[in-house]
Amino acid sequence: MSEGPIRVAPHPIAKRVKHGCKTPHVSHIDDYRSQHRETIGHESDKWWAKKAHELLYWDRPFHTVRSGSFENGDIAWFPEGGLNASYNCVDRWAFKHPEKTAIIYEADEPGEGREISYAELLREVCSIANVLKSFGVKKGDTVSVYLPMTWQAIAAFLACARIGAIHSVVFAGFSAEALRDRMQDCKSRVLITSDEGRRGGKAIATKAIADAALKECPAVEKVLVLKRTGNPVPWTEGRDVWWHEAVARVPRYCPPEVMASEDPLFILYTSGSTGKPKGVVHTTGGYLLCAALTVKYVFDVHPDDRFACMADVGWITGHTYIVYGPLAIGVTTTVFESTPVYPTPSRYWETVEKYKLTQFYSAPTAIRLLRRLGHEHVNKHDLSSLRVLGSVGEPINPEAWHWYNEHVGKTECAIVDTFWQTETGSIVVTPFPGAIETKPGAATVPFFGIEPAILEPTTGKVLEGNDVEGVLTIAHPWPSIARTIYGDHQRYLETYMKPYPGYFYTGDGAARDEDGYIWIKGRVDDVINVSGHRLSTAEIESALITHTGVAETAVIGTADELTGQAVYAFVTLKPEFKFDPENEAGLSKELILQVRKIIGPFAAPKRIYIVSDLPKTRSGKIMRRILRKIVAGEADQLGDLSTLADPGIVEVIKEKVASAA
């Protein structure tokens, strides 16, 4: 695993943070160190209680700060406390400054967006909450949300939270089959969707996809449909209800339901190494606190800032840093419906200039794409409002980091390369803009309350000191850690708590350099990270195997200049399947479409190789390690092949890959 000690010189604290008009929340490394010690020490409960009272409104006080352990899988934070996430994110700011912008909605077509005030957001949230109640939704019920990037998606989240319903948001790029599986798994009674979506100038058939999924979801009684484009869509009378018509029939205020701190707030599905998506459950109090804390401290957000996370609300990044984090501290958040290059590669920077955004949080894939298209698209815009630039989804490579720093940040903005996961709920390793010098590619230091431990993979021994590399774990529970996998607590324990008892297992490798900075080294399990999306190799293999001609398949991830990793698939065919070798491209296209249909476009393999056999041990285990080495151009480093049932197949595959290059 080790590539030798990491030696990278740090970059100084950014000028716009250090010498700007706003004093950073954490302004010196000594301040960071003392607070971090306080949050992991014997009296850390005092710090957490103080922050919980500072940042959140509690309807019912808590007396216990935390209980439970990794070993028992019974973690709880502020268990006696009662609160409502919707009230914390909307009502208190609507009462304090009703006309303040809550959401900047930048629609797909330039000029069609608008700003939504906290007062308007409160009315919409309450109206949708009352609509859901009229459908019979009550506390503890699950509502699925399959919406494009419209501002009403935020209202849907918060309407569920307001009445104590659990929202399960499904990314609107997922297929009908993926949506069906998630609705069935979480037992949804209601689906919220739209007639269509818009992205990059193209229509997305959201309602048609939802209808295909609903054919096998008889438990779904009502479908609330947002009119986004107004184009004709399939309709089922008695089940389907237009959003705007339903809102017109209900009261404009809905009192918030007081929820226990440990009541579920949402379920969000993430890829697992077994192929079956995991419904990760986050609870109300601890999750909301960490969302608020991290957006405030990691991005150095102040009350009049305008925060922009360019993710989709269908992923955890959107949940935490479009919806709950910014709104929990009463600042302006951004919903960006389009793509970085529509209608021109200046779209991001036009948006920054137009709304005077102060923080900008995006993925390395987007940064690499825009770098490739040229900095002239950036340089013609006034980006002087920006103070902090963020990166999320995967470690940002140094070339992209330097471009981001020089052309977007003008070498004056802080860059925070953040590490976290769906399961962590919020950022766990990150620079602090006013206190931590950064290194391109390094996640740097743990957030408050996070005590990372790098373990030797085989023995589980803690690797002390610097210049070490191993498996990244976390030593103690923190408030926003996921509490379970929906309907399968044993799988939760087996996945995160059992691999290294006493530690939370992230599934990522990590190194600690000579300065104690943490570097994320990528997945150590069978999960691929494509453009920040975690994809299970087993899930993609399962999609490929449904093709009538496929006998076996092996999927790997390999480095990709644009997307970080790309999906490559090796496929063997059934003997009886009639296949013309001259038409391999046609079959590959069929297989790619199969994956797009079953999972979604983002999971489509970049390359498919039709081969006569796969490298297997005598016991039948497919050696994906060998395939990864061949694709990476490291065929001379395959190591011992004596355990293979047919070592000769390696040469066949090498020739296949070389000829297709």
UniProtKB/Swiss-Prot annotation:
Kindly give the Pfam families that the UniProt entry links to this protein.
Answer: ACAS_N (PF16177), AMP-binding (PF00501), AMP-binding_C (PF13193)
Record has Ligase as a keyword: yes
Tell me which Gene3D superfamilies the record gives.
Answer: 3.30.300.30, N-terminal domain of ligase-like
Catalysed reaction equations from the record: acetate + ATP + CoA = acetyl-CoA + AMP + diphosphate
Query: Which residues are CoA-binding?
Result: 199-202, 317, 531, 596
- Keyword Lyase recorded: no
- UniProt name for this protein: Acetyl-coenzyme A synthetase
Taxonomic path = Eukaryota, Fungi, Dikarya, Basidiomycota, Agaricomycotina
Encoding gene (name):
ACS-1
